[in-house]
Amino acid sequence: MIRVLVVDDHDLVRTGITRMLADIDGLQVVGQADSGEESLKKARELKPDVVLMDVKMPGIGGLEATRKLLRSHPDIKVVAVTVCEEDPFPTRLLQAGAAGYMTKGAGLAEMVQAIRLVFAGQRYISPQIAQQLALKSFQPQVNNSPFDLLSEREIQIALMIVGCQKVQTISDKLCLSPKTVNTYRYRIFEKLSISSDVELALLAVRHGMVDASA
């Protein structure tokens, strides 16, 4: 029996995935988590074999949660399940140790296939994302996303800024001082050659970091 933990900040998504997997032979959803922080706690308590991890969540987010989870539980397999198809998200998650990366538009059969493959020690990447990653390797470096210049923490804070979260809110969620958050903000602006939150938001939309229709 493959033990699965579902991590997503949207209750409807977690419930939907859990219900879809309920009737699949050989799979058991042992729990749900609504944040990266809770996923670490649930992983310790429930000892899942596979974690279905959302990428964009409040708090530490799926990227950092994956890195921390695998540092403490290297035998767990993480499959990112997200709307983020554009790089640098797939590359970042795979570099962090995720064994799989698939979109939320995937069907039940694909999700079950991904879970079983990573449990068996293989990798799974949705075909459209695998194609993008393959094509990227043939592109000149100049065409790569400027967000590749940012660290994992900088990307996390950049997305929180784009999401209109105030410095104090970011400080509270990440357990950082406001001064440290402002330092990160300065570094982000410097690396991306921008000077305002509006420019950051536009750049994030242009490079697929956020959904323009959201």
Swiss-Prot record:
GO terms for biological process: phosphorelay signal transduction system; regulation of DNA-templated transcription. The keyword Phosphoprotein applies. Pfam families: GerE, Response_reg. InterPro entries: CheY-like_superfamily, Sig_transdc_resp-reg_C-effctor, Sig_transdc_resp-reg_receiver, Tscrpt_reg_LuxR_C, WalR-like. Residues 167-186 bind DNA. Signal peptide: none annotated. Keywords: Activator, DNA-binding, Phosphoprotein, Transcription, Transcription regulation, Two-component regulatory system. GO terms for molecular function: DNA binding. Disulfide bonds: none annotated. The modification 4-aspartylphosphate is found at residue 54. Required for production of extracellular enzymes and fluorescent siderophores. NCBIfam families: PRK09483.1. PANTHER family: RESPONSE REGULATOR UVRY, TWO-COMPONENT RESPONSE REGULATOR. This is Response regulator GacA. It comes from Pseudomonas viridiflava. The gene is gacA.
